[in-house]
Amino acid sequence: MANNKSAIELKNIVVDFGESVAIDNINLSVEKHQLVSLLGPSGCGKTTTLAVIAGLIKPTSGQVLFNGYDVTKKPPQERKLGLVFQNYALYPHMNVFENIVFPLYSDNSWKQAVLEKNSVANHEINCLLLTSNGASVQEIDQLNKLFHDSIEKPKQIQYQINDLNVSVFKNLNELTANLKLIPSKHQFAITNLNKQTLKQINELEAEFKTKWKLQKQTPIKSGVEHNAKLQAIKQHFSYEKQRLKKHYFKTKVELKQTLVENLKLVKKAISEQTKLIKQSSDYTKLKQLKRLIKVEPNQLKKQYKVFLNQLIKNYSLKTDKLTDTQLNEIEQIKTRIVSIKQFINKTALEVANKLAITKILTKRPDKISGGQQQRVAIARAIVRRPKLLLMDEPLSNLDAKLRVQTRQWIRQFQQELQITTVFVTHDQEEAMSISDVIVCMSTGKVQQIGTPSELYLKPANEFVARFLGTPEMNIIECSVKNNQLFWNNHLLVTESFKLNVEKLLVGFRYEQLVVTTNKSSLQAKLINIENLGKHLVATISLFDTTLSMRLELNSHLKVGDSLNFIIKANNLHFFDIDTKQRIEI
């Protein structure tokens, strides 16, 4: 069943802007109720990935699934999600309450859900009244079926339409996306050609000036010979410059021809694909369903109303035969019937109470603190009760202390509401403390997916190893001889390891380096000390390499001192020297 699927699934997502690939074939699943962090440096593609999930950016290729349903083509407002950005974007002319409720007034699907709840309550009351006035079990069952069909059948038809839209137009959509990319890729190629040609001309001019200057400075033995050499230099420069220009214009023409040919090929492929689609049985079924969705909801509602009116005519909706218990039950059901405005106020107050901002509801955004603004932004994002909450570096505008407090609060709040959350950050400490799962990214690719402890204790490659942990992991190149590790022909650790390579990268955390009095151990020079309050972080230099190590606060070492140290071998990490991937032993 679809509701057993992952909350979010990205399949082979590519975002190609022509001049650069922002996301390179990402596959990712986010399970229900998890808080998943997209972690990586600037430019790694994490915010673009979030934008694809939100529907703010259309992928060049690939699928976005929510609970098993394809939403790749759906706009953000139809994805039932909440968004919190780096800039909270609160409306300055509205107070906190008005900011929170604003999305509700502009969300037709949310209003429709409220009206549907009212319809359910009214239907339950009608069933109770009709039963008390003599309607049979079979008649009530038929009424329930007609009501259920009027609500659920249009939804099922829409789900079928969505699924068919994806399967029928998948190849065509990819071709159309490629067609849109061709001009930008052509422009990128022209830009590169311009840069390359300009660089070559500048280099040629620099070479010409150097040769001209040298010839000018050369002692003159013969004026004729001297002038001839100058003329030769000038002619060579003119010839080379002309050659570059010819090459430039020729390449430009070739690129233009390639553009025209590519456009022609893709347009032809689109035309052929369109013909195939129109001949397919799925396309015929899709057209039938689209016609059906226009009339079926009204027909189903009409059938329900006709049967309901017939039952009312036969049995009435009088309350004189109801017991006190039944009357109380009806009154209880009536409390669920509210106007749009009443429901908006009730929902907003519930959210404000959960986020502890009820005392500031009448204040404007400029009259509250940064932390409060952030909570208001979250309240506005979740007031529609979205299935997903997307947060793009929401803590970056807060000071260090408030950032720690707020991330703890977000985690607690997310666990209480059990809302599936995707959290973008470049701060590895933030991601480690708040996440169920971390997706570590670099250059548009997923480097590793796992729990915070999995990424920290077993990094999949050198990038993850360096990125997670403060200070970053020490990584050095070592050779392997007789199952022992050597760094610049010095024994690294006394322990042996079964490694089937001659060279590899060895990683170790700063706390694994320990000062020793053993003079035969590795010796380094202390070049920097940072006092972090609870301990010291020292930077040492050895074999033209800097390493980080931990020192206790009572250490008497100072910058410039030499020290001997050993490396604890119990948590060494090994990476392939070429692929940079983790080596398990």
Curated annotation (Swiss-Prot):
Highest taxon above the source species: Bacteria
Segments forming domain ABC transporter: 8-468
Pfam families with a match to the protein in the record: ABC_tran (PF00005)
UniProt entry keywords in alphabetical sequence: ATP-binding, Nucleotide-binding, Transport
One of the record's GO cellular component terms: ATP-binding cassette (ABC) transporter complex, substrate-binding subunit-containing
Binding site for ATP: 40-47
SUPFAM superfamilies tied to this protein: MOP-like, P-loop containing nucleoside triphosphate hydrolases
GO MF annotation, one: ATP hydrolysis activity
Family: Belongs to the ABC transporter superfamily.
Protein name: Putative ABC transporter ATP-binding protein MG187
Lineage: Bacteria, Bacillati, Mycoplasmatota, Mycoplasmoidales, Mycoplasmoidaceae
